[in-house]
């Protein structure tokens, strides 16, 4: 998926129209960072991605990072929200027992490479991964 052309045309009407939304997003992100309670974990935590959704390479990048850390001998776990999955709560994906409509297609794919936790709340997923011995958690 390519970035929209208007991203590179600062004087286009689309860019001008979206500019106030960009300022609002920036303000809300700043305020969230200032008012939120920082969470501390005992493992390296790396978040892959940003506002872009679908087709930007987040899953292949996550798999490549997992492979990199696995080759260094580290215990790597991935935490995913399980987009479009039916299951609730926090659980470890088992590629032999779960189906894509239950856990989401990307967690199921990534579970072929390393341990993957599905949790709508990231902090619960990270806590479960740490309890299971994760040294590196990829979000």
Predicted regions and their residues:
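Residue-level signal for inorganic ion chemistry
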Residues: 24, 59, 110
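Walker A (P-loop) phosphate-binding motif
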Residues: 30-96
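P-loop/Walker-type NTP enzyme "switch/lid" segment
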Residues: 80-139
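A transmembrane-helix-recognition feature enriched in membrane-embedded lipid enzymes
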Residues: 2-45
